[in-house]
């Protein structure tokens, strides 16, 4: 029996929507990364973009465990000498673009390279509950119901 290898023309992509309200960030990001890569499918092929299109809503209501809300730091460099900058997760979540916390968590769980960048383009994250993808008829997934540790009630 030969190993199955899916061709890019055989890929069938679905649209799924996940409500991130009160979900633990890392657990949500791991679930979304697996969906984007297509690892949940029996037809998974490592070199083919086989994942689904994922919409995450209510990203501003994400939950972080422990003291990560105040202590977790996101670093970046401006390109100038001594230009290292940082912001805490709290500053980002209370700032203009709170969805970036979820985007960064998922981005760092996907392999770096051309295929990873293509798979990451299938992720859409929105801070509120509104999204412009109703025409795609996304299937709702309840990540909180999969495991009791996925949801944080505090």
Swiss-Prot record:
<dbReference type="GO" id="GO:0003729">
    <property type="term" value="F:mRNA binding"/>
</dbReference>
<dbReference type="GO" id="GO:0006412">
    <property type="term" value="P:translation"/>
</dbReference>
<dbReference type="GO" id="GO:0003735">
    <property type="term" value="F:structural constituent of ribosome"/>
</dbReference>
<dbReference type="GO" id="GO:0017148">
    <property type="term" value="P:negative regulation of translation"/>
</dbReference>
<keyword id="KW-0689">Ribosomal protein</keyword>
<dbReference type="InterPro" id="IPR036899">
    <property type="entry name" value="Ribosomal_uL13_sf"/>
</dbReference>
<dbReference type="GO" id="GO:0022625">
    <property type="term" value="C:cytosolic large ribosomal subunit"/>
</dbReference>
<dbReference type="InterPro" id="IPR005823">
    <property type="entry name" value="Ribosomal_uL13_bac-type"/>
</dbReference>
<comment type="similarity">
    <text>Belongs to the universal ribosomal protein uL13 family.</text>
</comment>
<comment type="subunit">
    <text>Part of the 50S ribosomal subunit.</text>
</comment>
<dbReference type="InterPro" id="IPR005822">
    <property type="entry name" value="Ribosomal_uL13"/>
</dbReference>
<dbReference type="Pfam" id="PF00572">
    <property type="entry name" value="Ribosomal_L13"/>
</dbReference>
<keyword id="KW-0687">Ribonucleoprotein</keyword>
<protein>
    <recommendedName>
        <fullName>Large ribosomal subunit protein uL13</fullName>
    </recommendedName>
</protein>
<comment type="function">
    <text>This protein is one of the early assembly proteins of the 50S ribosomal subunit, although it is not seen to bind rRNA by itself. It is important during the early stages of 50S assembly.</text>
</comment>
């Amino acid at each position: 029996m030969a190993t199955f290898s899916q061709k890019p023309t055989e890929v069938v992509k679905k649209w799924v929507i996940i409500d991130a309200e009160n979900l633990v960030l890392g657990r949500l990001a791991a679930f979304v990364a697996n969906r984007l890569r297509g690892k949940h499918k029996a037809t998974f092929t490592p070199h083919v973009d086989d994942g689904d299109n994922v919409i995450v809503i209510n990203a501003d209501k994400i939950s972080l465990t422990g003291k990560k809300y105040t202590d977790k730091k996101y670093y970046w460099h401006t390109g100038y000498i001594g230009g290292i900058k940082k912001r805490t997760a709290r500053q980002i979540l209370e700032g203009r673009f709170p969805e970036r916390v979820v985007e960064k968590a998922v981005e760092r769980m996907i392999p770096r390279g051309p295929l990873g960048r293509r798979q990451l383009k299938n992720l859409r994250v929105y801070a509120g509950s509104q999204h412009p993808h109703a025409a795609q008829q996304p299937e709702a997934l309840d990540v909180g119901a999969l495991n009791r540790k996925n949801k944080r009630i505090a």
